[in-house]
Amino acid sequence: MANPKLTRVLSTRDRVQDTLSAHRNELVALLSRYVDQGKGILQPHNLIDELESVIGDDETKKSLSDGPFGEILKSAMEAIVVPPFVALAVRPRPGVWEYVRVNVFELSVEQLTVSEYLRFKEELVDGPNSDPFCLELDFEPFNANVPRPSRSSSIGNGVQFLNRHLSSVMFRNKDCLEPLLDFLRVHKYKGHPLMLNDRIQSISRLQIQLSKAEDHISKLSQETPFSEFEYALQGMGFEKGWGDTAGRVLEMMHLLSDILQAPDPSSLEKFLGMVPMVFNVVILSPHGYFGQANVLGLPDTGGQVVYILDQVRALETEMLLRIKRQGLDISPSILIVTRLIPDAKGTTCNQRLERVSGTEHTHILRVPFRSEKGILRKWISRFDVWPYLENYAQDAASEIVGELQGVPDFIIGNYSDGNLVASLMAHRMGVTQCTIAHALEKTKYPDSDIYWKDFDNKYHFSCQFTADLIAMNNADFIITSTYQEIAGTKNTVGQYESHGAFTLPGLYRVVHGIDVFDPKFNIVSPGADMTIYFPYSEETRRLTALHGSIEEMLYSPDQTDEHVGTLSDRSKPILFSMARLDKVKNISGLVEMYSKNTKLRELVNLVVIAGNIDVNKSKDREEIVEIEKMHNLMKNYKLDGQFRWITAQTNRARNGELYRYIADTRGAFAQPAFYEAFGLTVVEAMTCGLPTFATCHGGPAEIIEHGLSGFHIDPYHPEQAGNIMADFFERCKEDPNHWKKVSDAGLQRIYERYTWKIYSERLMTLAGVYGFWKYVSKLERRETRRYLEMFYILKFRDLVKTVPSTADD
């Protein structure tokens, strides 16, 4: 048998060079077309469109398109053109980048480093004479000793990877078990020791005492309360925190014995998740009007408020359950720290402390924005908060310590402002920090980094992008709702991934900002509030008293500012959608798709809840365009009798029952957005048992298993999407069980992956594992924090000075 040959993997530069040799004329023609467009940035579709139009015969076209250079173009995320050069940013797979530059006149090819590529890109703004002494940010050296996976499929599973690494290190070197002993010995609550006392000073002693304790407890009934053998364990070196019954104490001691003998990832994660570490949690969300009533729809106030209120209710329930099982008599505390707004617009945002309904130990703590002129009384945009955050962090820290009678155990930041304040607090207090971005603005505004000066007067992105970099690198762990939020898809760049390398010309150049392979990334998806969103089949819980108002909303013949259009055949199922009325959410696209699909119009009625109906009531330019488009569609396609348009609804309880009412009609939910970061309405609808059709662009593609628990639709191919919907309803007409089959599969998917219970369990476990990792990797973290501290003081604070303070008058 012949020996297999080793072949060299060609670099991007080599592949371009080879294509130049094989298809010189075609490639020169193509690259010349790029150069002829002049200086600028070309997007992926521009690159492919030119490829399609430049080539002559089909054979040559196929050879070039399917060859090495064609593959490079298909994986290029952008091209920078500065004649006679064309530079490509090539992304072979999520998280992996290469850069190459071609001189079209000389036909020379060179591989570029990240720094060289960004410097070339800066020529779009600064010309060829940019400052050679530009500040470059590079966090890679600080993470050299941090283990990380190499496969793109491992991104977002950081805790699993970290557990494998930690258990492997412990298995290979028993000396590495010492930090675990130290970690257990430092646990105290208000000065009282938990887990271990001074009688256990070494690993060998711990193993001996564990064996004695297990022997003692195994003779007891599993239900024996901890108090009945507490003093016996204390004499052996064990304090409270192991469990409330003999059975739970024994389970936890077995886990620790197994770890000391032969560490494995699942045992380590389970054990660290059971260690009592988190009693006081602080959640930061400074901007907007944060309240429990009359706030949704106010500026900068929406999904983040709903997310946090649902989050804390689930988190408190999980904390109480864990504390009880740990055998502790401790009341947890959760503080949502937000801004106090004296001019509160009829909300409770001027109250310092407010208990969260449905909880016993969770409060909203409001702290005002303060400057040298005094307290700021009015709301300000989230883009203008930067001058206030440093003082706010100090003031809020004092208020928090006063409320908790000590420092918190765990801090969670939300959005750019909350994450920066969380970073300042966590750095000062030395506690575990979790970051939740919700949205990273850099990805929402194309080219807002390279052309930051064009945006800065209005949005102050130089401050925001800098704050985001500081927070994501300071955080002990980051949670996202989807994989795509971290690393995108094969054809799109992830929100965090876009912060790996970018430049703000004249300010600084980021050559290694964040690594999406970092094990700090974890996907922890939220759910729907199951007190509001529950299956249509749970008849005893149904809010039947609301059915009258729901029927009025759906079927009333009156045409008002609240609803237009009528449904003449009430026996038809309802295809339902609910979203903001803007271009991205694409509600008008759904209406147009329905309008043009005769078969779908025969099978179902369409109901949408979106925005304003009266154009005079809207101040949003994008919404105004969509309102006019909706009215034109109704008129041009004669939709009256089959279509109902209802204005935006903020009553969540009624919205929950509305989903179930739609399910009673054997209807379905549609989410037609061009892009949806997560898709909370998709989760809400599926939780109520509604079969769901949702965009394949973004989070819903991960929520729904196509053809099983719902259906993916592509809003860029509306005819195909309409046919998928029509086929479903036609099949349901022939086989009524098909509707229930999809409904049940959707519910099963939710219960397995998308509930607040799963979320809170996971979050608490992550707090334990990363708390331990923070403890055992102090030195590496200290180096990173010093670098961040310097960047904050020398760069961020100067940028903040460029943001004008807001006046109350």
From Swiss-Prot:
Induction entry: By drought stress. By mannitol, an osmotic agent. Positively regulated by LEC2.
Function of the protein: Sucrose-cleaving enzyme that provides UDP-glucose and fructose for various metabolic pathways. Modulates metabolic homeostasis and direct carbon towards starch synthesis in developing seeds.
Reactions the enzyme catalyzes: an NDP-alpha-D-glucose + D-fructose = a ribonucleoside 5'-diphosphate + sucrose + H(+)
Stretches the record annotates as GT-B glycosyltransferase: 277-755
Entry's family note: Belongs to the glycosyltransferase 1 family. Plant sucrose synthase subfamily.
InterPro entries per record: Glyco_trans_1, Sucrose_synth_GT-B1, Sucrose_synthase_pln/cyn, SUS_EPBD, SUS_N
Record protein name field: Sucrose synthase 3
